[in-house]
Amino acid sequence: RVTVRELVKAGKNLQIGTLSDLQGHCEIGDYVRFHSNVHIGQKSKIGNFVWIFPYVVLTNDPHPPSENLLGVTVEDYAAIATMSVILPGATIAEGCLIGAHSTVKGLTEPHCIYVGSPAKNVGSTSKIKLPDGTSAYPWTQHFKRGYPEDITQNW
């Protein structure tokens, strides 16, 4: 079961995992991947080629319960690891990696790694290496599965 509420605007090739919940009034870009048990709060704005892994929650109410909802923004090519919580009004910058079990508030810097609760910037994503020694990020340099060739040839 997946719940997609009213006024969700989604781009091309959105993939939604089992038991995910997309609240209304959200904007979602092209080629976004939501794994299982993801919660996207109202007023969230998610860019293109974003990965959100299991049990991630994008919150939206800074003083619950209230009518003053602040959506989360996730920019292009960001990845949010399992069980992370993104607090109301936060912005995950382009190419950011949010580590598992992290709690993010405020603004992040592009292409940086954030871990912990509260999440802290621990450096550039370029310092993460694959087993062969090449950079794991940006992930578009080595991962193309499930994307059309006309898209990946421009990476």
Predicted regions: what is each one?
Residues 132-155:
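Acidic/histidine-enriched, glycine/proline-rich intrinsically disordered or flexible terminal extensions
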Residues 54-61, 129-132, 136:
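Short glycine/proline- and charge-enriched loop/turn segments
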Residues 110-135:
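Conserved beta-strand-loop-alpha-helix hinge in the C-terminal portion
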Residues 62-64, 90, 124-126:
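Conserved catalytic-core motifs of eukaryotic protein kinase domains, centered on the activation segment
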